[in-house]
C-alpha cells in the first residue's frame, strides 16, 4: 500500500472515530444542557475550562517531542514512550492538584471550587490518553486510538444518562466524565502496548533531555491553551454562570471540530519530518495536500454551523440555548482558521523550528488577550467568540511568517480558494431554500451535498485521497487499525 493510501486509511479511521465521538459527545451535551440548564451547565463548563487551562501548564511539550523522537529511524520507540509517559503523568497530576487548591482563592462559586478536584483527575487521564496518541501516530494505526476514544465517550454518556434519573447536579456529572476518561485511558494503554511494547521507567537523563527539548514547545502550548481557553475563562470571571453555559455549546463544538485537523497534522508529521531535510519538493507537496484537505474541512464546518445556528442550538440543547447563536456563527470561522494553524504548527516542529512556533504563538496570544479584555466585558459571549476569531487569525498569520523564516513558503492557495467559493455557493443555496419554506435540515443536507460535489468537481481536494478515504470507510471501517 502506498504511503498516501496508508495515510488516507488512517485519516479515514480518524474521521470515523471523531465522527462517532462527536455524535456521542453531542448526545452528552444534549443530555447535560437540557437537564442542568444554563447556570449548572455553566458550572460544569467552568470546571472543565479551568482544569484544561491548568493542565497545559504541565504539558512541557512532551507530546510533540515524543512523536518526533519516535518518528526518527533507529530509535527504540518503546524506551522513548516508557520514559516520557510517567513524566507526563507526574507533571500533569502535580500541577492540576496545585491548581485545584488555588481555585479556593478565586471568587468562583462553591460548586466550581469543589469541581476542580474532579477536574484534576479528569484531565490527568485525558492528557495521558492524548499523549499515548503519539504511539498510534508513529506507526500509522489510528483506528485503535479511535476505539478507546469512542468507548470512553459512550461510558460518559451512559453515566450522565443514569444520573439524570437521580436529578443530579454539575458535580456528579463531572464524576461521569471522570469515569469515561479512566476507561479511555485504560483501553489506550492496552492497545498501545500491542503496537509499541513499552515498560514504565524513570531515566532521569532522558527526562532532562525531553524537558529541555520541549521547553519552547511547552511555552507554545501554554500560549495556545491561553488562546483556546482564555475566552471561556475570562467570560466566567466577567459574566454570570448562565453566560458561560450559553457559550459552552459553541465552545464545545469548537473543541470537537478542531480536533480533526489536529489529528491530521499529527498523522502527517512523520512524513513531513523525513521530507523536510531531504526532499523540499515532496515536503511542499505533502504540506499542500494537507492544507487543501484542512481548508475543505474548515469551509464545510462554516456552512454546517453558520446558516442555521439558532435552530441547530435549539435542536442540541433546547430553546434556552438559542441565544448563543450569534456566538456560534462567529466561532465557526475561528474553527476554519484554527485547522490551518494546527497544520502549520506541526509543520514547523517537523522542520525543527520549535522556537519559531513559540514566537508566533506569543504574538497571537498578545493579540488574543487584547481582544478578549476589550470585547468580553462589553459584548459577553459574542465578544468571546469575536476574540477567538482574532486569536486564530493572528496565529495563522504569525505561523505563516514563521514558516517563511524557516525557509519554506505556503504552497498554492488555489484549492483553498476553490473551497471558499464552493462554500459560498452552497450557503447561498441553503438560504434560498430556507426563504422558500424548505425545512432547515433538508436545506442543510442539500447545501452539504452541493458543496461536496463542487469540491470534487473542481478538484479542490485530490481525487485519489477522496477515493481512498471513502473506500476505506465503506469497505473496512476500523480494520486498518
Model-derived segments and spans:
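Signature of the first transmembrane helix
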Residues: 3-63, 96, 100, 152-157, ...
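N-terminal membrane topogenesis motif
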Residues: 1-24, 75-78, 82, 204-220, ...
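Membrane-proximal transmembrane or re-entrant/amphipathic helices at the cytosolic face
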Residues: 428-481
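Interhelical loop/hinge segments that connect adjacent transmembrane helices in multipass membrane
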Residues: 1-3, 7, 143, 170-171, ...
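Hydrophobic transmembrane helix module of multi-pass membrane transport proteins
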Residues: 51, 86-223, 229, 431
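Alpha-helical transmembrane segments of multi-pass membrane transport and lipid-handling proteins
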Residues: 82-110, 114, 158, 162-165, ...
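Membrane-interface junctions at transmembrane-helix termini in multi-pass inner-membrane proteins
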Residues: 69-72, 125-148, 332-363
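Helix-loop junctions and terminal segments of transmembrane helices
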Residues: 25, 58-75, 138, 254-292, ...
Amino acid at each position: 500500500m502506498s504511503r498516501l493510501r496508508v495515510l488516507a486509511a488512517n485519516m479515514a479511521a480518524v474521521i470515523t472515530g471523531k465522527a462517532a465521538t462527536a455524535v456521542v459527545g453531542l448526545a452528552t451535551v444534549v443530555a447535560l444542557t437540557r437537564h442542568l440548564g444554563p447556570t449548572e451547565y455553566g458550572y460544569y463548563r467552568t470546571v472543565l475550562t479551568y482544569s484544561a487551562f491548568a493542565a497545559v501548564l504541565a504539558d512541557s511539550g512532551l507530546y510533540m517531542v515524543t512523536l518526533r523522537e519516535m518518528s526518527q529511524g533507529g530509535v527504540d520507540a518503546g524506551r522513548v514512550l516508557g520514559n516520557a509517559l510517567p513524566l507526563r503523568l507526574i507533571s500533569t497530576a502535580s500541577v492540576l492538584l496545585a491548581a485545584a487548591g488555588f481555585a479556593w482563592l478565586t471568587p468562583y462559586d462553591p460548586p466550581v471550587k469543589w469541581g476542580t478536584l474532579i477536574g484534576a483527575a479528569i484531565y490527568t487521564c485525558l492528557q495521558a490518553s492524548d499523549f499515548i496518541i503519539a504511539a498510534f501516530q508513529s506507526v500509522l494505526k489510528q483506528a485503535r486510538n479511535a476505539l478507546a476514544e469512542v468507548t470512553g465517550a459512550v461510558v460518559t454518556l451512559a453515566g450522565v444518562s443514569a444520573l439524570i434519573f437521580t436529578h443530579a447536579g454539575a458535580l456528579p456529572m463531572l464524576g461521569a466524565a471522570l469515569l469515561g476518561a479512566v476507561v479511555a485511558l485504560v483501553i489506550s494503554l492496552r492497545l498501545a502496548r500491542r503496537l509499541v511494547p513499552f515498560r514504565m521507567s524513570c531515566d532521569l537523563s532522558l527526562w532532562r533531555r525531553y524537558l529541555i527539548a520541549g521547553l519552547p514547545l511547552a511555552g507554545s502550548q501554554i500560549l495556545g491553551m491561553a488562546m483556546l481557553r482564555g475566552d471561556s475563562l475570562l467570560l466566567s470571571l466577567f459574566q454570570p454562570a448562565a453566560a458561560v453555559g450559553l457559550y459552552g455549546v459553541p465552545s464545545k463544538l469548537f473543541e470537537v471540530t478542531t480536533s480533526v485537523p489536529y489529528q491530521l497534522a499529527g498523522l502527517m508529521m512523520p512524513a513531513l519530518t523525513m521530507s523536510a531535510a531531504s526532499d523540499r519538493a515532496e515536503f511542499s507537496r505533502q504540506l499542500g495536500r494537507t492544507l487543501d484537505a484542512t481548508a475543505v474541512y474548515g469551509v464545510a464546518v462554516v456552512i454546517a454551523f453558520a446558516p442555521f445556528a439558532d435552530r441547530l442550538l435549539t435542536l442540541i440543547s433546547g430553546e434556552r440555548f438559542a441565544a448563543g447563536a450569534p456566538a456560534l456563527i462567529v466561532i465557526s470561522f475561528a474553527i476554519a482558521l484554527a485547522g490551518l494553524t494546527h497544520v502549520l504548527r506541526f509543520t514547523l516542529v517537523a522542520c525543527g523550528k520549535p522556537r519559531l512556533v513559540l514566537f508566533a504563538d506569543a504574538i497571537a496570544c498578545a493579540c488574543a488577550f487584547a481582544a478578549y479584555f476589550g470585547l468580553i466585558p462589553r459584548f459577553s459571549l459574542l465578544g468571546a467568540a469575536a476574540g477567538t476569531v482574532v486569536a486564530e487569525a493572528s496565529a495563522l498569520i504569525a505561523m505563516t511568517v514563521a514558516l517563511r523564516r524557516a525557509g519554506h513558503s505556503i504552497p498554492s492557495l488555489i484549492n483553498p480558494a476553490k473551497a471558499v467559493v464552493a462554500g459560498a455557493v452552497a450557503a447561498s443555496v441553503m438560504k434560498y431554500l430556507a426563504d422558500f419554506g424548505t425545512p432547515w435540515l433538508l436545506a442543510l443536507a442539500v447545501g452539504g451535498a452541493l458543496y461536496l460535489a463542487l469540491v470534487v468537481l473542481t478538484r479542490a481536494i485530490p481525487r485519489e485521497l477522496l477515493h481512498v478515504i471513502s473506500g476505506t470507510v465503506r469497505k473496512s471501517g476500523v480494520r486498518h487499525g
